[in-house]
Amino acid sequence: MTMMITTGNSFEGKVIKQYLGIVRGIVVRSPTISQGLMGGLKSIVGGKIGAYSQMCEHAREEAFQLMIEHAQALNANGIIAMRYDTGEIGQAGTEVLCYGTAVII
């Protein structure tokens, strides 16, 4: 079954038959020692911190997939109002949350 996902509050041309509630995927990541060292050096001289960008992208993708799995467990075929949120966990960890409302279309 294909999961339709939107950041909007509806799917154009579709009728939402049932709202199933909030679904989410949460991932907490911290950089490896080498990523931390490279990030520290980059922060001194400036520039893009590629290792951190890659870590964040992987965390977002994993959180997104976990949200989809949560929706599938509810037999949803759509997710509306999908959002990402991030926060720091301690000094070295970053939390990525992906959430939305599971629906049946």
UniProtKB/Swiss-Prot annotation:
Could you tell me which Pfam families the record lists for this protein?
YbjQ_1
Family annotation (SUPFAM superfamilies): YbjQ-like (SSF117782)
Q: Which domain of life is it from?
A: Bacteria
Recorded family membership: Belongs to the UPF0145 family.
Q: What is this protein called?
A: UPF0145 protein LPC_0273
State the organism named in the record: Legionella pneumophila (strain Corby)
